[in-house]
Protein backbone atom coordinates (compact mmCIF):
# COMPACT_ATOMS: atom_id res chain seq x y z
CA UNK A 1 0.00 0.00 0.00
CA UNK A 2 1.34 3.40 -0.98
CA UNK A 3 2.20 6.06 1.60
CA UNK A 4 -0.78 8.27 0.67
CA UNK A 5 -3.15 5.32 0.95
CA UNK A 6 -1.76 4.45 4.41
CA UNK A 7 -2.23 8.06 5.50
CA UNK A 8 -5.81 8.06 4.17
CA UNK A 9 -6.64 4.80 5.99
CA UNK A 10 -5.33 6.26 9.27
CA UNK A 11 -7.28 9.49 8.70
CA UNK A 12 -10.59 7.92 7.65
CA UNK A 13 -10.79 4.82 9.84
CA UNK A 14 -12.21 6.62 12.91
CA UNK A 15 -14.98 8.55 11.09
CA UNK A 16 -16.14 5.35 9.36
CA UNK A 17 -16.04 3.37 12.62
CA UNK A 18 -18.00 6.15 14.37
CA UNK A 19 -20.86 5.28 12.00
CA UNK A 20 -20.71 1.64 13.09
CA UNK A 21 -18.89 0.39 10.00
CA UNK A 22 -15.47 -1.03 9.25
CA UNK A 23 -13.16 0.63 6.73
CA UNK A 24 -12.49 -2.51 4.67
CA UNK A 25 -9.96 -0.73 2.47
CA UNK A 26 -9.45 1.99 -0.08
CA UNK A 27 -8.01 2.61 -3.51
CA UNK A 28 -6.64 5.87 -4.85
CA UNK A 29 -6.55 5.77 -8.64
CA UNK A 30 -4.64 8.73 -10.09
CA UNK A 31 -5.85 9.89 -13.49
CA UNK A 32 -5.42 13.67 -13.62
CA UNK A 33 -8.78 15.43 -13.23
CA UNK A 34 -10.49 12.06 -13.22
CA UNK A 35 -8.72 10.61 -10.16
CA UNK A 36 -10.85 8.45 -7.86
CA UNK A 37 -10.68 7.83 -4.12
CA UNK A 38 -12.73 4.67 -3.58
CA UNK A 39 -13.57 3.58 -0.03
CA UNK A 40 -14.97 0.17 0.82
CA UNK A 41 -16.98 -0.05 4.03
CA UNK A 42 -18.40 -3.16 5.62
CA UNK A 43 -20.67 -4.16 8.46
CA UNK A 44 -21.87 -7.49 9.88
CA UNK A 45 -25.43 -6.59 8.85
CA UNK A 46 -24.42 -5.58 5.32
CA UNK A 47 -24.05 -2.19 3.70
CA UNK A 48 -26.95 -0.29 2.19
CA UNK A 49 -26.98 2.76 -0.09
CA UNK A 50 -27.91 4.97 2.88
CA UNK A 51 -24.80 3.75 4.72
CA UNK A 52 -22.62 4.70 1.75
CA UNK A 53 -24.22 8.15 1.49
CA UNK A 54 -23.77 8.82 5.22
CA UNK A 55 -20.15 7.62 5.15
CA UNK A 56 -19.50 9.76 2.08
CA UNK A 57 -20.73 12.89 3.91
CA UNK A 58 -18.59 12.13 6.99
CA UNK A 59 -15.48 11.29 5.00
CA UNK A 60 -15.93 14.34 2.73
CA UNK A 61 -15.99 16.61 5.77
CA UNK A 62 -12.71 15.12 7.06
CA UNK A 63 -11.07 15.31 3.63
CA UNK A 64 -12.15 18.94 3.21
CA UNK A 65 -10.47 19.89 6.50
CA UNK A 66 -7.33 17.74 6.22
CA UNK A 67 -6.92 18.16 2.43
CA UNK A 68 -4.51 15.20 1.93
CA UNK A 69 -5.07 15.08 -1.85
CA UNK A 70 -4.10 18.31 -3.59
CA UNK A 71 -5.49 17.46 -7.03
CA UNK A 72 -9.10 17.02 -8.13
CA UNK A 73 -10.71 13.64 -7.47
CA UNK A 74 -14.07 11.92 -7.11
CA UNK A 75 -14.97 10.22 -3.83
CA UNK A 76 -16.78 6.89 -4.12
CA UNK A 77 -18.01 4.84 -1.16
CA UNK A 78 -19.29 1.30 -1.60
CA UNK A 79 -19.55 -2.11 0.00
CA UNK A 80 -16.69 -4.52 -0.77
CA UNK A 81 -19.11 -6.80 -2.65
CA UNK A 82 -19.00 -10.53 -3.24
CA UNK A 83 -15.67 -10.51 -5.09
CA UNK A 84 -14.22 -8.12 -2.55
CA UNK A 85 -10.73 -6.74 -2.76
CA UNK A 86 -8.42 -7.96 -0.01
CA UNK A 87 -6.05 -5.45 1.55
CA UNK A 88 -4.57 -6.93 4.75
CA UNK A 89 -3.10 -10.15 6.14
CA UNK A 90 -6.14 -10.45 8.44
CA UNK A 91 -8.50 -10.28 5.48
CA UNK A 92 -6.60 -13.03 3.65
CA UNK A 93 -6.63 -15.13 6.86
CA UNK A 94 -10.41 -14.81 7.04
CA UNK A 95 -10.64 -16.46 3.61
CA UNK A 96 -8.38 -19.49 4.11
CA UNK A 97 -9.77 -22.23 1.89
CA UNK A 98 -11.27 -19.75 -0.57
CA UNK A 99 -10.16 -18.91 -4.11
CA UNK A 100 -8.46 -15.57 -4.75
CA UNK A 101 -6.93 -13.81 -7.71
CA UNK A 102 -3.82 -11.70 -7.14
CA UNK A 103 -1.97 -9.32 -9.43
CA UNK A 104 1.69 -9.03 -8.47
CA UNK A 105 4.28 -6.32 -8.82
CA UNK A 106 7.08 -8.87 -9.32
CA UNK A 107 6.47 -12.32 -10.86
CA UNK A 108 6.23 -15.45 -8.70
CA UNK A 109 6.69 -18.80 -10.45
CA UNK A 110 7.00 -16.85 -13.71
CA UNK A 111 3.65 -15.08 -13.45
CA UNK A 112 2.31 -11.73 -12.28
CA UNK A 113 -1.28 -13.01 -12.20
CA UNK A 114 -2.15 -15.92 -9.96
CA UNK A 115 -5.43 -17.61 -9.13
CA UNK A 116 -5.42 -20.10 -6.31
CA UNK A 117 -6.68 -21.22 -2.93
CA UNK A 118 -5.51 -19.44 0.21
CA UNK A 119 -3.87 -22.11 2.36
CA UNK A 120 -2.46 -19.84 5.05
CA UNK A 121 -0.97 -16.53 6.06
CA UNK A 122 2.29 -16.33 7.99
CA UNK A 123 3.07 -12.77 9.03
CA UNK A 124 3.21 -10.82 5.79
CA UNK A 125 3.45 -13.92 3.58
CA UNK A 126 0.46 -15.44 1.75
CA UNK A 127 0.44 -19.17 1.06
CA UNK A 128 -1.43 -20.04 -2.14
CA UNK A 129 -2.16 -23.37 -3.78
CA UNK A 130 -2.04 -22.75 -7.53
CA UNK A 131 -2.69 -25.74 -9.79
CA UNK A 132 -1.48 -28.09 -7.06
CA UNK A 133 1.70 -26.11 -6.36
CA UNK A 134 2.24 -24.33 -3.04
CA UNK A 135 3.46 -20.79 -3.59
CA UNK A 136 4.51 -18.17 -1.05
CA UNK A 137 3.76 -14.56 -1.97
CA UNK A 138 4.84 -11.51 0.02
CA UNK A 139 1.79 -9.35 0.73
CA UNK A 140 3.73 -6.23 -0.26
CA UNK A 141 4.23 -7.84 -3.71
CA UNK A 142 0.46 -7.94 -4.25
CA UNK A 143 -0.68 -4.97 -6.31
CA UNK A 144 -4.31 -6.09 -6.18
CA UNK A 145 -6.01 -9.15 -4.72
CA UNK A 146 -9.62 -10.18 -4.61
CA UNK A 147 -11.90 -13.02 -3.60
CA UNK A 148 -13.39 -15.12 -6.40
CA UNK A 149 -17.06 -15.86 -5.76
CA UNK A 150 -18.39 -19.39 -5.98
CA UNK A 151 -21.85 -19.71 -7.49
Curated annotation (Swiss-Prot):
Name of the protein described by the UniProt record: Ribosome maturation factor RimP
Sorted UniProt keywords: Cytoplasm, Ribosome biogenesis
InterPro entries assigned to the protein according to its UniProt record, in alphabetical order: Ribosome_maturation_RimP, RimP_C, RimP_C_sf, RimP_N, RimP_N_sf
Disulfide pattern: none
Functional note: Required for maturation of 30S ribosomal subunits.
GO cellular component, one term: cytosol
NCBIfam families: PRK00092.1-1
Family: Belongs to the RimP family.
Subcellular location as annotated: Cytoplasm
Organism: Shewanella halifaxensis (strain HAW-EB4)
GO biological process: ribosomal small subunit assembly; translation
Xref: CDD domains: YlxS_C
Pfam family for this entry, one: RimP_N
Domain of life the protein comes from: Bacteria
Native organism taxonomy: Bacteria, Pseudomonadati, Pseudomonadota, Gammaproteobacteria, Alteromonadales
Amino acid sequence: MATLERKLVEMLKAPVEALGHQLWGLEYIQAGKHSILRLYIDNEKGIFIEDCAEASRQVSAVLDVEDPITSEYTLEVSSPGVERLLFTAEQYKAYIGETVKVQLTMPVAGSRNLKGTVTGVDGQMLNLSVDGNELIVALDNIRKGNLIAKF
